C-alpha cells in the first residue's frame, strides 16, 4: 500500500467527516473535533499499532480503533480530570 496516498486520503476523508464511526463513538466526550476523530479512524484502517498517551475519556482512542484491526495501547495517569478544549473556560 502507498502510505503517502493513504495519509492523503485519510486527511481528505477526515475533513469531510467520513469514517466508520457510529454516533455512539462520536458522542464520547472529548477535547477534539469530529474531523480529527474521522482522520484517526481512517488512518488506522490499514492496521498496525496505535499508541495514545493521554487517553482522558477515550474519544480519540475509541475513534482510532473502532472497526479497525489494530493493536492499540492507551496510557493515562488521570491526573487532570478537568481538561477543557483550548479557548473554552470551565463553567462552575
State the predicted function of each range.
Residues 4-6, 10, 23-29, 37-92:
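S-adenosylmethionine/decaboxylated-SAM
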Residues 16:
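Extracellular/lumenal glycan-associated surfaces
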Residues 19:
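Conserved P-loop NTPase mechanochemical-coupling segment
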Residues 33:
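Helix-loop module immediately N-terminal to the HCX5R catalytic loop
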